[in-house]
Amino acid sequence: LSKTSINGRGKAKKITPEVLEGTHSYQISTKAKFAFHSFSNYYTYPMQAIVSLPDHQFVNPDQNMIKKFDPSLKKDNPLEFFEITTEDNVTMEGWIVKPKNMDPNKKYPVLFYFYSEPAGQTGQNRFGAGYNRLYNGNLSEDGYVYVTFDGRGTPSPKGREWRKAIYRNIGKINVRDMAMGAKAVFKKYDFIDTSRVAVHGWSG
């Protein structure tokens, strides 16, 4: 969350604590004096708190996210974030979970997880990233690579042109981004077995 002058002068100033790297949402009160703040990242269970605005102070000390936040948990999570640029010069962000105890001489099968439409993102830094609740086990421990990235048309903070790119083009531009993105992932991570590729997605 950021604040700026109502006259448009000066630069916007971020008021969300820098240490809380991840995904945030705010429900702001009518007079904008308070907000219900939600936060999580890939290694932090969701937290909620009431904060005052514009100073972003935690109204209830027991809900102080900064004190509860434990960055040391990061080291125990195998998820990594990445950025790729496709042959179409489209840059996309996502995450990858590599197999546990990887053998550098082996290649591993990959499961892509996609949505790539306006209702949401899959590549966010939020709790649950890197896990597939439909899989009865642990993909990483079972020797699979698990990957997602957000293509054009998703509500990524990349501006109107990005979000509106698939207007009247659903199933065309976003599907191409998935295909070209997969090629870029194969090029970036040479331990992926390109003969063993699976794709899972939702309504997109």
What does each model-found stretch correspond to?
Residues S5-R9, L53-P54:
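Short loop/turn segments that connect beta-strands within beta-propeller blades
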Residues T16-P17, H24-G204:
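Serine-hydrolase catalytic core recognition
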Residues N7-R9, E21, A119:
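Feature targets compositionally biased, intrinsically disordered low-complexity regions
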Residues T4-S5, D76:
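Short, compositionally biased segments
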Residues L1-T4, D177:
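Extended hydrophobic/Leu-rich segments
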Residues R9-P17:
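Blade-edge beta-strand/turn elements of extracellular beta-propeller
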